[in-house]
Design a protein with these regions (language model features):
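Bacterial Sec-dependent signal peptides at the C-terminal "C-region" and cleavage site
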Residues: 3-18
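Sec-exported extracytoplasmic/periplasmic mature domains
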Residues: 26, 56, 68, 72-75, ...
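Solvent-exposed, acidic/flexible segments
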Residues: 26, 30, 44, 56, ...
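Elongated, non-catalytic scaffold/linker segments and compositionally distinctive motifs
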Residues: 23-87, 91
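Beta/coil-rich, acidic/histidine-enriched accessory regions frequently appended to metallopeptidases
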Residues: 16-36, 65-69, 273-276, 307-465, ...
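TPR/TPR-like alpha-solenoid helical repeat scaffolds
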Residues: 48-57, 75-95, 407-411, 415, ...
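Juxtacatalytic substrate-recognition/specificity segment
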Residues: 96-217, 227-236, 248-260, 264-272, ...
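Amphipathic alpha-helical substructures
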Residues: 19, 27, 61, 235-275, ...
Length: 511
């Protein structure tokens, strides 16, 4: 998601320094805006322009103060009060942040446990710049600035998104005002793929710069979702199983979402399922375009959109000789060729800032109190040393025809392990990881089984993925440190050992 800064200006003559700052910011050219700001004066229009530049740079307190100082003639201007309130909320949300810059990347975050994110945040952004930027025709000048918010509430305060929209769709990252606003994995009850999300938001920034912000949301999201893994791999990743399931169902029922419904933001769709379906649709459209015409096709589309071409027509121009119907028909044929398996899977609900326990974040048990009740009885029996009886209850929590539950799979695996049935537990966990790859607890359990069986390479893969989703488990960090040491990688072993020690210390409470 992307948005333009709205510089609050008085009706003034053209080509003033304030106009120049605005023009630079509209082009996402921070270096240009800095240079233009050198000619700003002390009039209200100049103060407002300086405030907008500072806001784009993440300097919220001076931005607020300069915009407030411009109130002599701007107080009654349309949007002034809302803009000033946003600057104030942003200043409060980041008041305890520290800033670190490496090369032309700046990351701001709260001291404490979120320090385990900063090294890999820098590495992800640098890799995205080096690997993805050239595919899209370059990257914005002036570097990139990112904030890592420790809670979803702070992200909401600083993002301008309604809290209700964030809680409905789970959108907890944003590219806006030439900055990346990203929530810590702690903001979601089970963590999330935050590094791919960083790359995703950076791609939004690139697309906005390349097109002068003329790309509609569906095209932005299609490019970002299809390219977000390319910072670490050479080809777009397959659809997540839950997304593939939703897309297969929509194709079968002829219930694909119209592109217009995705405007003005995916955050305003009606449910997590609808948002996931939208992402699946638009990302596969872009993957199809890449496969049909090569990786450079996306950059060609951006060139045309920048020139004012309608986005879908630009895609059709590059992908199907200008024939929109032919492109869409080709895309549908491509989807059929994927042989999407319509396995019944559930989409996890949105649980933010510790609002629920591990049952609440489960995609099945979080929605079915009756099944959760049976599973909780199983937990009691397992804790009492009665794994056979626990299995009976766990089976009640997984009736035929219902989607699989990742939490229930891990609980059942625990009971099987207690009964010395490790091969059965491993098979169950492997299936759960295939269906729900972003559940760290399942990957951690599978990793432990693989380690016990001497499969250190496979165990490393599971613990690496688990820590990528939820980096705040000190035990997983310690195990990953051991596995890096066994691979002869002393620097990464020490990094994750340091993270484990940090996570076992006391951290001040955050709001």
């Amino acid at each position: 998601m992307i948005g333009l800064p709205a510089v609050l200006l008085l009706p003034i003559a053209a080509a003033t320094p304030a106009d120049d700052v605005k023009a630079c910011l509209d082009r996402y050219d921070i270096a240009c805006a800095r240079q233009a700001a050198g000619s700003l004066g002390s009039d209200d229009a100049s103060l407002a322009a300086r405030a907008e530049l500072e806001f784009a740079l993440g300097e919220f307190t001076p931005a607020r103060d300069h915009l407030k100082a411009a109130s002599r003639s701007l107080a009654s201007a349309e949007g002034y009060a809302e803009r000033l309130a946003l600057f104030e909320r942003s200043a409060v949300a980041t008041a305890d942040f520290v800033s670190e810059t490496r090369a032309d990347v700046t990351v701001r975050s709260r001291p404490g446990f979120d320090a385990v994110l900063t090294d890999e945040a820098f590495e992800t952004l640098q890799a995205a710049h080096d690997r993805i930027g050239p595919l899209l025709g370059g990257a914005p000048p002036g570097g990139v600035r990112m904030e890592l918010y420790p809670t979803a509430q702070r992200f909401i305060d600083a993002s301008s998104l309604p809290g209700s929209a964030v809680r409905t769709t789970g959108v907890i990252a944003l590219s806006k005002w030439t900055r990346l606003l990203v929530s810590s994995p702690r903001a979601l009850g089970r963590g999330y793929g935050w590094k791919d999300t960083i790359a995703h938001e950076y791609i939004h920034y690139i697309v906005a710069w390349r097109t002068e912000d003329r790309a509609p949301v569906w095209l932005q999201e299609g490019i970002a979702r299809s390219h977000e893994a390319l910072w670490r791999t050479d080809q777009p990743e397959p659809l997540a199983p839950t997304h593939a399931s939703l897309l297969a169902e929509a194709l079968a029922n002829d219930s694909l979402l119209p592109l217009a419904k995705m405007h003005p933001s995916m955050a305003f769709l009606s449910s997590p399922e609808e948002a996931s379906l939208a992402y699946a649709q638009v990302s596969t459209m872009v993957v199809y375009l890449r496969q049909a015409k090569g990786p450079g096709a996306v950059s060609e589309v951006l060139d045309r959109v920048r020139e004012g071409r309608d986005a879908l027509q630009a895609v059709a121009d590059v992908g199907a000789g200008g024939d929109q119907a032919a492109f869409m028909a080709g895309w549908r044929a491509y989807l059929k060729g994927l042989k999407l398996v319509g396995r019944k899977l559930a989409e996890a609900g949105v649980v933010l800032d510790g609002a629920g326990d591990e049952y609440a974040v489960d995609p099945v048990l979080g929605e079915r109190a009756d099944l959760a009740r049976a599973a909780r009885i199983g937990d009691i029996l397992l804790d009492a040393g009665r794994p056979d009886a626990a299995l009976v209850e766990y089976r009640k929590a997984a009736p035929d025809g219902e989607p699989a539950s990742p939490l229930l799979s891990s609980r059942t695996a625990n009971a099987l392990i207690a009964l010395k049935r490790e091969p059965d537990a491993r098979k169950l966990l492997e299936g759960s990881v295939r269906d729900y790859p972003e559940f760290a607890v399942t990957r951690t359990m599978l990793g432990k089984l693989l380690l016990a069986a001497g499969s250190t390479g496979a165990a490393f893969t599971q613990f690496r993925h688990a820590v990528d989703v939820d980096p705040f488990d000190p035990a997983s960090q310690a195990t990953l440190a051991d596995l890096y040491a066994a691979r002869g990688d002393a620097p990464l072993s020490e990094r994750h050992r340091r993270y484990s020690r940090l996570l076992q210390s006391n951290e001040p409470a955050t709001r």
